[in-house]
Amino acid sequence: MHGLLLAAAGLLSLPLHVVAHPQPSTSLAGRGVDLDAYRMADRSSYMSSDDMKLKQPAIASLSGGNYVDTATEVVKRMMPGMTFRMADDHYVGESGISHLYFRQTMHGMDIDNADFNVNIGKDGKVLSFGHSFYTGPAPDRAPVEKRDFSGPMRAFHGACKALNLPINADKATIQTMNEHEVMFVGTSGAMSDPQGKLCYMAKEDGTLALTWRVETDMGDNWLLSYVDAKETDKVHNVVDYVSHATYQVYRWPIPDPTEGKREIVENPWNLKTSPFTWISDGKTNYTTTRGNNAIAQANFDGGEDYLNNYRPNSKNLKFEYPYAPNMSPPKSYIDASVTQLFYSANIVHDLYYMLGFTEKAGNFQVNNHGQGGKGNDFVILNAQDGSGTNNANFATPPDGKPGRMRVYIWTKAKPARDSSFEAGTVIHEYTHGLSNRLCGGPANSGCLNGMESGGMGEGWGDFFATAIRLKPNDNRNANYVHGEWVNNSPKGNRLYPYSTNLQTNPLVYTSCNKYNEVHAIGTVWCSILYEVLWNLIDKHGKNDGPTPVFENGVPNDGKYLAMKLVLDGMAIQPCKPTFVQARDAIIDADMNLTKGSNKCELWKAFAKRGLGVGAKYDPKNRTGSKAVPKECQ
């Protein structure tokens, strides 16, 4: 195979120079390309704990041996005769659930969008599983035997042309990485050397396509483009690791600078979740905004370099710099901006760690100090990023590669406003990293690229930002609007406020039928989760402190319990989940964590907004339901 790749590359190393406008956009709109048209379909199935007992009792009764053997047996029984491999990112989560991930193979190559995840409960029995394995006709011969496909350089050319990417490959050469993967060396315009991988892809029409997966990190978009290996001018699907948004933002825990004053905090880290503090990686102690979890700096030109960019430095570790909302221009308070961004991101790291986003779950750290997972992947935090305005985004590559958060200046007020000072931006964007690492496993960052699954990615960000900002006197009548301060508008930037009042916010599951945009769908998902939040708070009370209190591994209040169940559900659900599957995963998370003691509170919350027992997913005609199980009526 090495010889075949190199031979094809040598014949097809065509000069390439594609020019595009460097305008950031979630859809490459500045280059005339709509990425939504290339989204993968949400095609996973999910077998919940309750469904499995009824439909697959033999699977439900599996136990004994180790969890790897049990999970492998599930895949063998459910998919007899199919070939697959186990990913190396399986782990036992903080809730005691073992999460294992498998990838379907064909003729020794991955089917890149065919995944199977199995969840083994604390009792050693199968809790649930989900999959998107391909079950259609298989090619009778391996492509390497027929040699009827084009080489990687032609596919690279096809991806750049179809997506109008500003990459110059006039002097590009191909470097073979392994049997099926190559690197394009000598290009310019991308933030790192593009890569190619020969793999299959299951198409929406039920057939299988041989593709070159071309990976290009363009900064505002980090793309996996599945180019047909025979017709290289055809791009089947595109996954974007970058999640873009314009969100409600607030300073931790203050919603925005209008609701509080800046104060000096001393040693704000939690040594249980950041044992090296925030300004050390266990090997080097820093006197700047750099540590094990994150590295923060100015990025005025919007470029890819960050190590050499400006960041405040204080030998006496006093990161105390002036800032007021009426200061202008933004560069005049860059020290305060970088410091605030660094503080907020580290706070989120520590909180999510407590809730279960640890090293083995794929969190963002340089030094995992022997706790599992892959290190060398802190979050790169770019303050006042010059690549855009009125936005923010987060790039989530697989575990072991740094995440990248860009926060911009907002120009909807005078003077302009810096979103580093609203922690909601950081919470929302960081949550993209959380959900992309948990869903499908730490090694698979492409599980939330469908329209409904991508919408949930946005909704989870809103949910965590909203739950964290709850005030001590709030009750279920509290309404929250996203984006008031940065947008300079009391209506914010969402369709409706988050509310438990159906007149204030009428969104239900079937509202998604009229939306074809991830932020709108995300607003529906967060509206549903907001009902979950208040049902659990009404039952268990609300901890207004900055961190959860656990009793036997379970948060003892409703707010943090809701956050914990939603986070656990991310790890349980299948790759490219639907609302229905994510609902079932949250209910299964509660079954594992509390033995189902909150089952009815959860079902009633989901049913209130149309995601009850009879809800069914169809991308164009979802069916709503307000029904709950008999035991909850």
Curated annotation (Swiss-Prot):
Organism per entry: Trichophyton rubrum
Glycosylated residues (UniProt): N285, N592, N621
Note describing how the cofactor binds: Binds 1 zinc ion per subunit.
Protein name: Extracellular metalloproteinase 5
Propeptide boundaries: 22-245
Alphabetized UniProt keyword annotations: Glycoprotein, Hydrolase, Metal-binding, Metalloprotease, Protease, Secreted, Signal, Virulence, Zinc, Zymogen
Protein family membership: Belongs to the peptidase M36 family.
One term of GO molecular function: zinc ion binding
Record function comment: Secreted metalloproteinase probably acting as a virulence factor.
